[in-house]
From Swiss-Prot:
Quaternary structure, from the entry: Interacts with TMC6. Interacts and forms a complex with TMC6 and CIB1; the interaction stabilizes each component of the complex. Interacts and forms a complex with TMC6 and SLC30A1/ZNT1; the interaction regulates zinc transport into the ER. Interacts with TRADD; the interaction competes with TRADD/RIPK1/TRAF2/cIAPs complex I formation and facilites complex II formation. (Microbial infection) Interacts with human papillomavirus 16/HPV16 protein E5; the interaction alleviates TMC8-mediated transcription factors inhibition.
Biased composition (Pro residues): 652-662
Alphabetized UniProt keyword annotations: Disease variant, Endoplasmic reticulum, Glycoprotein, Golgi apparatus, Membrane, Nucleus, Phosphoprotein, Transmembrane, Transmembrane helix
Provenance organism: Homo sapiens (Human)
Alphabetized InterPro entries for the sequence: TMC, TMC_dom
Homology family: Belongs to the TMC family.
Gene name tied to this protein: TMC8
BP GO terms, sorted: intracellular zinc ion homeostasis; negative regulation of canonical NF-kappaB signal transduction; negative regulation of protein binding; negative regulation of protein-containing complex assembly; positive regulation of apoptotic process; protein stabilization; regulation of extrinsic apoptotic signaling pathway via death domain receptors; regulation of tumor necrosis factor-mediated signaling pathway
Tissue specificity statement from the Swiss-Prot or TrEMBL entry: Expressed in placenta, prostate and testis.
Protein name (record): Transmembrane channel-like protein 8
Location of region: TMC domain: 362-530
Length: 726
């Protein structure tokens, strides 16, 4: 209740009186713009605040009434939209089941997979809205025949005759050649000159991948920092007490046995995580300096071994890609086409297993083990994709190589007339191969292993058991597929559609594998820190995809034979041309100034000011949080002072008093004390216990509080009446 305290008590000097605090709080609530509905007070207090804000007889302005009505309508619409979104949410029931049976750590993987599906659908919607629909609706003029280039390519390779017998429709689909002349690849997009069209398809095609990357970056960053404000308010080392979880975890609205079983598993997993973290914290506190030094040296040894594995994997991928691109005339041409994806898949299959084995040797905490394994797996995967991109650049774009066919046209025109399509086909094959590997591993490895383990008995089968569902490895697979999709946004604009289908099917495949064929980890972990690392890994993949794309768009010559930018030295050259055609001289000068070095100095000063303001605001928020914590502690102590004053002022019941009729009716609603005579948690320090019902033994009177000896019986003070007395 927001009522002033009428009982005075001893107070330290400098502490304001309760009446002053109450008046200040009333004044703050009166002038605050926070809706009364959102205030953390009882209904009686909210009515009082409402009367303070709108006294009786005072007519509010029409604008204020309209504003209040609009806020109410917006709030109701927002709540209705949130309820509708929760009701129509994708895989809500499946996520609830997985979280209850296997814990929030494994559930975070499936939630992350759903988030990636949403990102791909948004990217597809952006590309279809700004590129595909205008291209179909406006029907831009035909650019005419392509340039007839006379190529001088000594010793150029031709397709080997033995390859023709393998060219069936299935192989064309797997390699992407069946879709070469469709909108799946870059080469099928053709328009006329910019001056002959109202809507610039070239500019839309150029900016759509950049907008998709920016949209994915903002969504990932928002999801990453989603829990940081709550973590800042609660503190770094905050943990909810086990007593609160024991008494408040159960949902009493459950009426179905299956839901009750899932809820029991969920509570059990939460307690396992809490107890495991507490046990490890105690072990860390008991270690000596020598044990700590040995532990750090073992950590260093494991990380060095993991680094050597990454270097070896990168070397294997580089030589496999180089051999595949340099030996196209051999009879094994079809197998060599899938040699780089095969080596990358083999590395990504063996790497997480080795990393998990090495990390588990050091007995890390579960969260640290998952995050460290995930970091090394991501380093391996992103490094392999980076090396794959570098090797393609050396072969197709002659980056770092001296080749005569690259001097005149800027790329290896003898072997790759439309090099954007070639790069798109490589990324298409990589995406297809990753999904096929996921399907094959689920139904050709995990399923037979489960059937054999369930069918036979013995030491070997007991040792083999079901496969453990490794979260780092599964996260690595979907992050790798998403990174490949981002890398192919320019060369294969509809690759997000393909990846969306793969992610949708992957969810059900992984769910079946988890529920039927796998076993959960015996060491559960929290979802909070793992979710943060998932988003961090995704940002690293986004950075890996954005750097090559920016380099290609700004510096690499486009193909002379296909695509939208055949007459441009680089795709970005279309932007200055459109600026010169569509903007007045003032706008051109303004854009030229924004892109010049002279604008960098005021931009740097402005960013410095913004950064200073943000840092200052962060520090002010931290100080405010510290003050609010102290105020909360003071309020708890103030309530205990009120209880002490009340216990001193109320009369003690005499020995002849009988319970029931002699107590006034107002005492019937008096709360019971959960710890009569003992200092309860949150009380201001240790005080002499108030004796309640005690146990008498041979030694005399005992205190009801554990570990404390009672006072004489004559020192009895007032205590709250028990339930039997009431």
């Amino acid at each position: 209740m927001l009522l002033p305290r009428s009982v005075s008590s001893e107070r330290a000097p400098g502490v304001p009186e309760p009446e002053e605090l109450w008046e200040a709080e009333m004044e703050r609530l009166r002038g605050s713009g926070t809706p009364v509905r959102g205030l953390p007070y009882a209904m009686m207090d909210k009515r009082l605040i409402w009367q303070l804000r709108e006294p009786a007889g005072v007519q509010t302005l029409r604008w204020q009434r309209w504003q209040r009505r609009r806020q109410t309508v917006e709030r109701r619409l927002r709540e209705a939209a949130q309820r509708l979104a929760r009701g129509l949410g994708l895989w809500e029931g499946a996520l609830y089941e997985i979280g209850g049976l296997f814990g929030t750590g494994i559930r975070s993987y499936f939630t992350f997979l759903r988030f990636l599906l949403l990102l791909n659908l948004l990217s597809l919607l952006l590309t279809a809205s700004f590129v595909l629909l205008p291209l179909v609706w406006l029907r831009p003029p035909d650019p005419g025949p392509t340039l007839n280039l006379t190529l001088q390519c000594p010793g150029s390779r031709q397709s080997p005759p033995g390859v023709l017998r393998f060219h069936n429709q299935l192989w064309h689909v797997l390699t992407g050649r069946a879709f070469t002349n469709t909108y799946l690849f870059y080469g099928a997009y053709r328009v006329g000159p910019e001056s002959s069209s109202v809507y610039s398809i070239r500019l839309a095609y150029l900016l759509s991948p950049l907008a998709c990357l920016l949209l994915c970056f903002c969504g990932t960053l928002r999801r990453m920092v989603k829990g940081l404000p709550q973590k800042t308010l609660l503190g770094q080392g905050y943990q909810a007490p086990l007593s609160a979880k024991v008494f408040s975890s159960w949902d009493f609205c459950i009426r179905v046995q299956e839901a009750a079983t899932i809820k029991k598993h969920e509570i059990s997993n939460e307690f396992k995580v809490e107890l495991e973290e507490g046990r490890r914290f105690q072990l860390m506190q008991q270690q000596t300096r020598a044990q700590t030094a040995c532990r750090l040296l073992s950590y260093l040894r494991v990380n060095v071994l993991n680094g050597l594995l990454v270097v070896g994997a990168i070397s294997a991928i580089f030589w496999a890609t180089k051999y595949s691109q340099d030996n196209k005339e051999e009879s094994l041409f079809l197998l060599l086409q899938y040699l780089p994806p095969g080596v990358i898949a083999l590395v990504n299959f063996l790497g997480p297993l080795l990393f998990t084995f090495l990390v588990q040797l050091e007995n890390y905490p579960p969260n640290t083990e998952v995050n460290l394994t995930l970091i090394w797996c991501v380093v391996l995967k992103l490094a392999s994709l980076g090396m794959f991109s570098v090797s393609l650049g050396q072969t197709i774009l002659c980056i770092g190589r001296d080749k005569s066919s690259c001097e005149s046209y800027g790329y290896n025109v003898c072997d790759y007339q439309c090099w954007e399509n070639s790069v798109g086909e490589e990324l298409y094959k990589l995406s297809i191969f990753n999904f096929l590997l996921t399907v094959a591993f689920a139904f050709l490895v995990t399923l037979p292993r489960r059937l054999l383990v369930d069918r036979f008995s013995g030491r070997f089968w007991a040792w083999l058991e079901r496969e453990e569902f490794l979260v780092p490895k599964n996260v690595l697979d979907i992050v790798a597929g998403q990174t490949v999709t981002w890398m192919g946004l320019f060369y294969c604009p509809l690759l997000p559609l393909l990846n969306s289908v793969f992610l949708f099917l992957t969810f059900y495949i992984k769910k079946y594998t988890l529920l039927k064929n796998s076993r959960a980890s015996s060491r559960p972990f929290r979802a909070s820190s793992s979710t943060f690392f998932f988003q961090l890994v995704l940002l690293l993949g986004l950075l890996l995809a954005a750097v090559p794309l920016g380099y290609v768009v700004s510096s690499i010559h486009s193909s002379w034979d296909c695509g939208l930018f055949t007459n441009y030295s680089a795709p970005w050259q279309v932007v200055p041309e459109l600026v010169a055609l569509g903007l007045p001289p003032i706008g051109q000068r303004a854009l030229h100034y924004l892109g010049s070095h002279a604008f960098s100095f005021p931009l740097l000063i402005m960013l410095s000011l913004v950064l200073t303001v943000c840092v200052s605001q962060t520090q002010a928020n931290a100080r405010a949080i510290h003050r609010l914590r102290k105020q909360l502690v003071w309020q708890v102590q103030e309530k205990w002072h009120l209880v002490e004053d009340l216990s001193r002022l109320l009369p003690e019941p005499g020995p002849s008093d009988s319970p029931g009729p002699k107590y006034p009716a107002s005492q019937a609603s008096r709360p019971q004390s959960f710890c009569p005579g003992c200092p309860c948690p949150g009380s201001p320090g240790h005080q002499a216990p108030r004796p309640g019902p005690s146990v008498v033994d041979a030694a005399g009177l005992r205190s009801p509080c554990p570990g404390q000896h009672g006072a004489p019986a004559s020192a009895r003070r007032f205590r709250f009446p028990s339930g039997a007395e009431l």
